[in-house]
Amino acid sequence: VPNLQEVACVYGSKVGIAATKNNGKNWYYVGTANLPEPMQGQSTFWAPDVFKHKDTYYMIVTFIPGIHPFWGGDARLVFYKSKDLMNWDLVEEIEGTHGCIDASAFQMPDGTWKMWYKTPDSKTNTGVSKDLTTWKVTGKCEIDDVPHEGPIVFYWKNKYWNIIDECNLGYVGLHCYESDDATNWTYNSTILDKPGLRPDDFDQGRHCDVVVIGDRAFIFYFTHPGRTYKMDGMEVEENTWNYHRASIQIAELEYVDGKIVCDRDKYAKKVPSPIERKKK
């Protein structure tokens, strides 16, 4: 779409669906989820968190009415359920989440559910649900040491983990926190803060999700492969297609000497980065 102002290109988005037939080696585009919108008009969906409980799929997603040229809009978290991942029923707009985005939900040992999300002041707050029919925000902040977004919680290696994306235009990567109780978090490590070698993997890792399969954990993250950086690590900002373009990547997490590490180049074949291509 030509002549979009500032960040308007990231608004008006739907929830896209991709699928794989060979255990994640290759993916293909399926379409967009059929989500009843809480209000009429062209709106925006961001950061869906999808999980399954018994025979039903659930989704907590950021909903923003309208298209905006600058970061903003009346965001809130909305809760859906589905039997087939394509067609969804609206359960509720989660009360108390206006201005909040990027939810992640996980079931606790007592059977209740907990969610983590970004507040308007870029901290991680929480909410709870007893039976996935309604959510209640707690008002409790659990991570606030750096401004951040996109908290993702999972259980692996006998610990709870929360990976966040620091709100910074510099090259900072993703920060990992660990916890024994999914409430009190301690910084563990930073990953995906160095350029990778795979196609479109030259940028820092951004907003992620993690899938645990047995004893292995795989991180899905996105990059902006067309972006370049100054000597001080800050982005050279542009309002161009190449600057805004995003690519989804997958890598494996490893647990080494008590730390989460991620070698994004473990299976890579080197290709030239945007900077290397410009030098030719």
Regions found by a protein language model. Give the residues of each.
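Carbohydrate-active catalytic/glycan-binding domains of CAZyme proteins
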Residues: V1-K280
